């Protein structure tokens, strides 16, 4: 105790200061320090393991590389899937397209049935390409990938499709008779209908009176002029009550409705031929149409 009192303040501070080990290799601390990595003096407690410590995180967590790549991959719609992928996924028919594809079907399609289950797409191509150019062809498969025994072939030209039907219909392929029918036809543009002459109906009741009564059997005594009397005889029949030729053919105004009274006396009828009557009738028809 007395020794401590005799020591100076600096010596007391130096004696109470705990020796610190260095973090470098082979620390400089006193005591039993063995100089390991991050070691400290014997009085500084157990050494820490810094191997598992990492730097400060910039994010709360990190995703696995594989999961991140799968998440960042571009999503693709089924619209952009190929025919082969759709057929493999849903089991539809496999179709081979010859040449560039088109969204509009322009060829003539044949439907082939009663095929042997061992017939392949190459067999169909080899068989029907001998007739003409093919746009596409294919065997129909079910969901399990087995052939349904049917196929379809699309020819570029309709004439080739008809020739294929005549050549291969009811012909054996691998021991079975093929049944071929046309299901896709090229419909030519419909021909324009022949325009008939326009039929203009005559007015039945207009400013000229009852046209049917005047010309369809009942001649009212007025034919671009006034007849004598109130005749209602038929145009081709015998007049009644004065009728045809009951007065003079005077060039006055024709009456409306039933025949008016003629302005002439009892003279002889003028000789009128059939041609004159036809001409007058045509003229009256023309005036009736212009008036209406």
Curated annotation (Swiss-Prot):
Keyword line: Acetylation, mRNA transport, Nucleus, RNA-binding, Transport
Compartment annotation: Nucleus, Nucleoplasm
Chief location category: nucleus
Compositionally biased region (Gly residues): 23-42, 241-252
InterPro entries: ALYREF_mRNA_export (IPR051229), FoP_C (IPR025715), Nucleotide-bd_a/b_plait_sf (IPR012677), RBD_domain_sf (IPR035979), RRM_dom (IPR000504)
Domain RRM: 108-185
The keyword Transport is annotated on this UniProt entry: yes
Family matches, as Gene3D superfamilies: 3.30.70.330
GO terms, molecular function: mRNA binding
Region (Disordered): 1-50, 241-292
Keyword Transport: yes
Disulfide bonds: none
Gene Ontology CC entries for this record: nucleoplasm; plasma membrane
One annotated GO biological process: mRNA transport
Xref: Pfam families: RRM_1
Residue ranges crossing the lipid bilayer per the database entry: none
Assembly and oligomerization: Interacts with RH15 and RH56.
Family annotation (PANTHER family): RNA AND EXPORT FACTOR BINDING PROTEIN (PTHR19965), RNA ANNEALING PROTEIN YRA1 (PTHR19965:SF35)
Function: Export adapter involved in nuclear export of spliced and unspliced mRNA.
Family stated for the protein in its record: Belongs to the ALYREF family.
Entry protein name: THO complex subunit 4B
UniProt lineage: Eukaryota, Viridiplantae, Streptophyta, Embryophyta, Tracheophyta
Encoding gene per record: ALY2
């Amino acid at each position: 105790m007395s020794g401590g009192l005799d020591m100076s303040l600096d010596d007391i501070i130096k004696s109470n200061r705990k020796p610190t080990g260095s973090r470098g290799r082979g620390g400089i601390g006193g005591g039993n320090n063995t100089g390991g990595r991050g070691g400290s003096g014997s009085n500084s407690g157990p050494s820490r393991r810094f191997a598992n410590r990492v730097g400060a995180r910039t994010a709360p967590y990190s995703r696995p590389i594989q999961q991140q790549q799968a998440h960042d991959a571009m999503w693709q719609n089924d619209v952009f899937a190929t025919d082969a992928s759709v057929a493999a996924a849903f089991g539809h028919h496999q179709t081979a397209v010859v040449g560039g594809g088109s969204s509009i079907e322009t060829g003539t399609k044949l439907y082939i049935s009663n095929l042997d289950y061992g017939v392949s797409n190459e067999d169909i191509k080899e068989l029907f390409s001998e007739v003409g150019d093919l746009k596409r062809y294919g065997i129909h498969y079910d969901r399990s990938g087995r052939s349904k025994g049917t196929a379809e072939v699309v020819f570029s030209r309709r004439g080739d499709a008809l020739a294929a039907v005549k050549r291969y219909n009811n012909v054996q392929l691998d021991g079975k008779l093929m049944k071929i029918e046309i299901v896709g036809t090229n419909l030519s543009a419909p021909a324009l209908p022949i325009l008939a002459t326009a039929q203009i109906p005559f007015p039945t009741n207009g400013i000229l009176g009852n046209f049917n009564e005047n010309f369809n059997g009942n001649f009212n005594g007025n034919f671009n002029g006034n007849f004598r009397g109130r005749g209602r005889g038929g145009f081709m029949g015998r007049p009644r009550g004065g009728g045809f030729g009951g007065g003079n053919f005077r060039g006055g105004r024709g009456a409306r409705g039933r025949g008016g009274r003629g302005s002439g006396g009892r003279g002889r009828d003028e000789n009128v031929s059939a041609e004159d009557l036809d001409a007058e009738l045509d003229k009256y028809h023309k005036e009736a149409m212009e008036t209406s």
